[in-house]
Amino acid sequence: MSIDFTPDPQLYPFESRWFDSSRGRIHYVDEGTGPPILLCHGNPTWSFLYRDIIVALRDRFRCVAPDYLGFGLSERPSGFGYQIDEHARVIGEFVDHLGLDRYLSMGQDWGGPISMAVAVERADRVRGVVLGNTWFWPADTLAMKAFSRVMSSPPVQYAILRRNFFVERLIPAGTEHRPSSAVMAHYRAVQPNAAARRGVAEMPKQILAARPLLARLAREVPATLGTKPTLLIWGMKDVAFRPKTIIPRLSATFPDHVLVELPNAKHFIQEDAPDRIAAAIIERFG
């Protein structure tokens, strides 16, 4: 299944590019020149989430932002399970296809585990790490486990698939200022029906189901990436990834880190504070 949607060039002023992975066709943007930065989104977003950051960085960095299979403008292939390890393998293929070297790895939400799974297998090619409102270890709080179980229940799965619950409810709830109608239209347009939303519906299940991968990342990220220069950027009003719970663990994992707190940002920091994020990346790595 392909997505028939053309983004507004005023909001998304980028050329669409495509990569035929072993599992399906990936849409991505590749803007600017300079040191590469891989921008990995979460659920239920797509590369559109990074639009303002890309515009701010592309004079200094090569900004590479893929849409996972099942997200954004990428294909919804039959036979793809939309599990996190599958996404990571496809994005790994994509990184190798582009030949990214000495790249910055940025992830938010599920972009954290996916970007880290790619990076641990290519640690010698990773220049630095940028993480925001994310994690990469097995769910270890009652809140995360309960969220996964509730979102995996038949009534909520129905709401995700049939009523676009994640886009309609969680994006507005996860931003300090409700996105404009034009912005929300771009999130809706790439998840037009139940068949298109299978990837969105699977991700909350993966909080528990991806435990083997997350356990491996909990071991391998400190061992392979722990000495990399790191930027932690945190929306301090995020009720899902609470700073007091997660920042101490990330700080211990990456001793060479700089922490930037975004006091007025919630979960979707790229919507709430794109200029602050871009400035922090330039200051740390520019």
From Swiss-Prot:
EC number annotated for this UniProt entry: 3.8.1.5
InterPro entries tied to this protein: AB_hydrolase_1, AB_hydrolase_fold, Epox_hydrolase-like, Haloalkane_dehalogenase, Haloalkane_dehalogenase_1
Keywords from the named record: Hydrolase
AB hydrolase-1 domain segment(s): 35-134
Record bears the keyword Hydrolase: yes
Highest taxon, organism lineage: Bacteria
GO cellular component terms, semicolon-separated: extracellular region; membrane; plasma membrane
Hydrolase keyword on record: yes
GO molecular function annotations of the record: haloalkane dehalogenase activity
Active site (catalytic residues): D109 (nucleophile), D238 (proton donor), H267 (proton acceptor)
Catalytic activity: 1-haloalkane + H2O = a halide anion + a primary alcohol + H(+)
Pfam family, one: Abhydrolase_1
Family (UniProt): Belongs to the haloalkane dehalogenase family. Type 1 subfamily.
Record's subunit section: Monomer.
Family matches, as NCBIfam families: PRK03204.1
Protein role: Catalyzes hydrolytic cleavage of carbon-halogen bonds in halogenated aliphatic compounds, leading to the formation of the corresponding primary alcohols, halide ions and protons.
Protein name per the record: Haloalkane dehalogenase 2
Organism this protein belongs to: Mycobacterium tuberculosis (strain ATCC 25618 / H37Rv)
